[in-house]
Amino acid sequence: MALLEDIPAIRVLMQLSINGLLKPYLTERQLEASIESMGLDEQLIKDQTYFIVNKDNIFVGCGGWSNRKTLFGANHTPNRDDSFLNPEADAARIRAMYTHPDWARMGIGTLIMNVGEKEAKKAGFTKCELMATQAGVSLYKNHGYIAKEEINYESASGASVSMTRMEKHLK
């Protein structure tokens, strides 16, 4: 479980992940814009729904789930909605998944996603939804998520970043 005191280390991990794993998919301008659409939503930590994977005192992964309406973004992202979802009608959100580039494709993201889905199910949700970066789509597809909508996030600087809204029914 992530704690508020972990925030500085989480931010470093997020920056490493964005710069290391998204670089093959995005231009430099899009990478800069990604920082606006991604990052840490501290509400997840306050809600105790955000997790970290720590290996030898190094954060190698983080992510979580949410029962709030905001689908993606950080504290600074426009159009946030911290109102609660209805588990009987809405999908829980899988949020802010980041892996250290040196630990990519070693099961860290899968571990965090599985914990988030399990916790969402315990909270009464029957499905999960997330907003995937181009780098994450294949991971989520491999775990049963289905692409529902392609969006282009337009940053304040005018750069457009392609993302995919995905959904999964929990078993």
Question: Where do the PLM segments sit?
Answer:
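A short beta-loop-alpha structural element at the N-terminal edge
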Residues: 1-12
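Conserved acyl-donor/pantetheine-binding loop and adjacent beta-alpha core of acyl/acetyltransferases
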Residues: 54, 62-104, 119, 153-162
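C-terminal "cap" of GNAT-fold acetyltransferases
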Residues: 126-137, 143, 149-171
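Conserved acetyl-CoA pyrophosphate-binding loop and the N-cap/start of the following alpha-helix
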Residues: 102-103, 107-115
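Conserved GNAT-fold acetyl-CoA-binding loop/helix
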Residues: 15-40
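Hydrophobic beta-strand residues of extracellular immunoglobulin-like
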Residues: 49-52
